[in-house]
């Protein structure tokens, strides 16, 4: 069975269709992988600007907000009282996978440390596995998280599911300084700096997320085992001044499923995030029949 790596990229979405003055190269790796993907499309998520746990729980369990009722606002508060939580992780465990999560933030936040073992995760690598020197802005860099994941994969012979929850592009964006270097790397037409300061910070981190995607792709190609890479955004960022000045995004994010094997023309399919786990299982199972 293939190695499976899934990245839940903090505040990731493609802002270029909404703001055409953004340099297209900001997401050059994402564009390339999208063209090579097994499946890609827009992703409907139950969160806007925050509340990652709503998107995360829908992905891992396949449960919609309607299923959760009043617990839709913090599903893990309910899940922490359960003894076993069915979903994607349990399915992968039954298929022989060792399931681990990498998230550079305290494990107790959202009670993940209580919920994840009940989902079937074997290990949780939280902020204790990273140093303050590995920050980019306010949080651990995507580069550091990618490097950690690559080393983990390179040093095991086990059949692995690695679930990565990044933090670098988490706000508040206005607390950060403007990115160094020429703004031309972020924009083709420099916007009003007063209205776009948060956008510049966001795009700087978005470009780092794009580099992370490229790092993971290159590493998975080198593994002896075939691999599947899933990538999606949990929600759009909070950038109220940007939205008021330049327009609001739809609230959808993007996803892609890329494989090191048998990829022809990508399937285009817009999904709800609670459907994404099934799509990833399909990408794995297709390998069995080939």
Predicted segments, located by residue:
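Solvent-exposed soluble domains appended to multi-pass membrane proteins
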Residues: 9, 16-19, 24-290
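Membrane-interface segments at or immediately adjacent to transmembrane helices
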Residues: 1-6
């Amino acid at each position: 069975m293939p190695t499976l790596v899934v990245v839940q990229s903090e505040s990731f979405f493609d802002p270029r269709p909404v703001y055409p003055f953004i340099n297209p190269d900001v997401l050059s790796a994402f564009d390339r992988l999208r063209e090579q993907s097994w499946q890609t499309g827009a992703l409907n998520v139950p969160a806007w600007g925050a509340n990652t746990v709503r998107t995360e729980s829908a992905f891992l369990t396949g449960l919609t907000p309607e299923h959760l009722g009043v617990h839709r606002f913090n599903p893990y508060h309910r899940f922490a009282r359960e003894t076993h939580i069915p979903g994607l992780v349990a399915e992968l465990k039954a298929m022989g996978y060792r399931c681990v999560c990498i998230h550079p933030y305290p494990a107790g936040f959202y009670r993940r440390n209580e919920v994840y073992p009940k989902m079937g995760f074997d290990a949780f690598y939280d902020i204790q596995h990273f140093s303050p020197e590995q920050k980019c802005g306010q949080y651990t860099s995507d580069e550091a998280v990618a490097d950690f994941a690559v080393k983990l994969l390179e040093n095991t012979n086990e059949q692995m599911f690695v679930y990565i929850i990044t933090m670098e592009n988490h706000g508040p964006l206005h607390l950060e300084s403007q990115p160094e270097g020429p703004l031309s790397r972020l924009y083709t037409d420099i916007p009003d700096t007063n209205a776009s300061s948060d956008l510049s910070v966001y795009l700087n981190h978005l470009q780092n997320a794009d580099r992370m995607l490229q790092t993971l792709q290159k590493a998975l190609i080198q593994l002896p085992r075939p691999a599947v890479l899933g990538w999606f955004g949990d929600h759009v960022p909070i950038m109220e001044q940007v939205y008021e000045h330049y327009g609001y995004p739809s609230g959808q994010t993007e996803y892609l499923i890329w494989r090191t094997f048998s990829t022809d023309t990508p399937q285009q399919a817009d999904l709800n995030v609670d459907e994404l786990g099934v799509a990833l299982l399909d990408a794995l199972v297709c390998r069995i029949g080939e």
